Amino acid sequence: MSEKSRILILDDEKNYLLVLEALLSDAGYDVTPINDPEMAVSYLEEAEVDVVITDMKMPKMSGLDVLQQIKRSSPSIPVLIMTAFGSIESAVEVMKYGAFDYITKPFANDELLLSVHNAVELSRAHQQYRILQESLEERYSTHQIIGKSPAMRETLSIVDRV
């Protein structure tokens, strides 16, 4: 990894936070552990992260609630849901809401690392897409082709209103 990918881990169980933080830090990720869902949502409003890993069952707010909030504000961030109470029904439910993956506790380290790696790759692809899209918009926008003089801007403004 050239630049460390940023991973937010959300779990109300401190032992899992410690294990996940150690595992992912050792794998080269920049990890932010948070044990409160509301704090995590606030953190995401200010910070940029590449991937979120959240527990499903937590006090105050469920992992599904966190997932829904993330998908409303930052739909391109991959979210991995972890739970000790896994079922096919809950896996299908969170996937319908946009979860990237559903991992049951206890987890296999290799499985988790592979899922995180794939989520990071998706996040990077989204970032590259946004950069290319902005570059194309800047390169081929009409004001680049026509000009930036005040007279041309006024003319374009009139055209836009029509």
Locations of regions flagged by a protein language model:
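Receiver (REC) domain active-site loop signature in two-component systems and cognate sites
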Residues: 58
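AAA+ ATPase active-site-proximal loops
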Residues: 133-162
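A Lys-centered signature of the CheY-like receiver
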Residues: 97, 105, 148
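Two-component/phosphorelay signaling modules centered on CheY-like receiver
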Residues: 14-32, 46
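Acidic, metal-coordinating helix/loop segments flanking the phosphotransfer/catalytic sites
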Residues: 33-51
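Active-site residues of response regulator receiver
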Residues: 11, 55, 83
